[in-house]
Amino acid sequence: MLIFPLINDTSRKIIHIDMDAFFAAVEERDNPALKGKPVVIGKDPRETGGRGVVSTCNYEARKYGIHSAMSSKEAYERCPKAIFISGNYEKYRTVGDQIRRIFKRYTDLVEPMSIDEAYLDVTDNKLGIKSAVKIAKLIQHDIWKEVGLTCSAGVSYNKFLAKLASDFEKPHGLTLVLKEDALCFLAKLPIEKFHGVGKKSVEKLHDMGIYTGQDLLAVPEMTLIDHFGRFGFDLYRKARGISNSPVKSDRIRKSIGSERTYAKLLYQETDIKAEISKNAKRVAALLQDHKKLGKTIVLKVRYADFTTLTKRVTLPELTRNAAQIEQVAGDIFDSLSENPAGIRLLGVTMTNLEDKVADISLDL
């Protein structure tokens, strides 16, 4: 017996665009001498005493098992000839904006998921093109011609399948999943490839003998709900290619933050407070850009031994004032117990966001 109704809208035309090794690809585009060489976006461990982490890397570097969040030291050990580049995030953001403008030629229903990927609903697109595959090919062509980068595209009738499809053939691939092919497509996939299924859920599913989409399809709904609660129903739907989540052109931001990992550990309070100030000003600028105000300020501190502390303070009124954010974040730091270990990461985040309203004085 079904606990929740199964409604499968297969009438939509959804595209998921995922840029190929985006940061590294931008660097290769701007420096052709890098092409064909393993490129890692991250601090060179030879210059930082082995500290730092990999932000991303190109496909050549991935052949050596290098991946994002790996320590730069391990990346170097795996591939001593890798070229490490610190990265220019303002440049990447500018390129990302250029790509989003290309998306907007075809539809206003664009939901950016990050700087290098987005969902597009092209069911009723601006050019009246009936084929979503044709639109995906045009977007790939436009991005290559105007930006000099490649992307992979997934096309299907919902976001879940489109996302899986874009991962299926990279780089510069295009995969279509029709409604009549969805079950076959999902059946062959390892369960860890299912978007939205995290590491702990994968471990639990493996313990239940579920390794593929085909295995998941065979499990009764109530069994999944008993083991996973409401998420069990989501798994039941995913196995059947059902997801009616809309493409939201204006995603509701739940938080705005800025954090930085330091190649050289921070010990001195003056240095720590200076970095808190930089993060606070960055958050204030982002709040201004997104026309948001916030009430809860969160400070994140990660020490040399990777112990991570987060502490928050909720203000009585909304703000986006840099000095106020800096003051509160600094006060939070002062309230933490002293730790002789150096600090490797500091972050400041504003949550409890609301849209800007006219009757609030923002800079007082």
From Swiss-Prot:
Its main location: cytoplasm. Poorly processive, error-prone DNA polymerase involved in untargeted mutagenesis. Copies undamaged DNA at stalled replication forks, which arise in vivo from mismatched or misaligned primer ends. These misaligned primers can be extended by PolIV. Exhibits no 3'-5' exonuclease (proofreading) activity. May be involved in translesional synthesis, in conjunction with the beta clamp from PolIII. The lineage of its organism: Bacteria, Bacillati, Bacillota, Bacilli, Lactobacillales. One of its GO terms (biological process) is error-prone translesion synthesis. Its EC number is 2.7.7.7. It comes from Streptococcus pyogenes serotype M18 (strain MGAS8232). PROSITE patterns: UMUC (PS50173). It is found in: Cytoplasm. It catalyses: DNA(n) + a 2'-deoxyribonucleoside 5'-triphosphate = DNA(n+1) + diphosphate. Pfam families: IMS (PF00817), IMS_C (PF11799), IMS_HHH (PF11798). This is DNA polymerase IV. Residues 14-198 form the UmuC domain. Monomer. The gene is dinB. It is an enzyme of class 2 (transferase). The active site is at E117. PANTHER family: DNA POLYMERASE KAPPA, DNA REPAIR POLYMERASE UMUC / TRANSFERASE FAMILY MEMBER. GO terms for cellular component: cytosol. Mg(2+) binds at D18, D116. Binds 2 magnesium ions per subunit. Its cofactor is Mg(2+). Keywords: Cytoplasm, DNA damage, DNA repair, DNA replication, DNA-binding, DNA-directed DNA polymerase, Magnesium, Metal-binding, Mutator protein, Nucleotidyltransferase, Transferase. Transmembrane segments: none annotated. Belongs to the DNA polymerase type-Y family. One of its GO terms (molecular function) is DNA-directed DNA polymerase activity. The record marks F23 as: Substrate discrimination.
